[in-house]
Amino acid sequence: ECYRQRSDIRACAHAHPPTATGFACAGYSLENCVLPEIVLALGGIPLTPYGTPGGTEIPDAIRPYLNDYDAFLLANHGCLTVGKDVFDAYYKLEATELFAKISLTARLLGGEKPISPPQVQELYEARPRYGISRQTRCVHCGDEHEGACEAPSGAPKESGPAAGSAAGQPADVQRIVEEVTRLVREQL
């Protein structure tokens, strides 16, 4: 499906990197405009709806996202990236996993702090200087980068190109800390 929909795609990489897959299994996208390198190189990383492996459900699930993104979290499954060659697709897969680790750490430390819309716009305008010709869009503030560049708080969503993202709410952090503490104590 990737090759049919976009002529610039010459390679796909699919894997189950643990942190990115954890986000996919928890129902969270990686679309907040937080890390300049990711905004510059990938834009955002949406969570696609669940599809049963081996059939047409996964290609059907990613189809609505292919024109706007190069990296995807596959709900309850893993990660898929596309690129101009195998090295480009692999680099994007590695970048997705690194961003997932950074995002998880930021959320555990109290929440992500998004880049301002003017700063996001500046990064998008810098893409040609770095040889990045594709323009992706911010699902939270749109192409014009007006408004907040972060996902609205609330329950994660997995349907549609504007899928939600974890908000790093204090109650969530507290629950995680309590669970980790309990598990550590069990091991002592």
Protein language model regions, located:
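Glycine-rich flexible loops
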Residues: 1-188
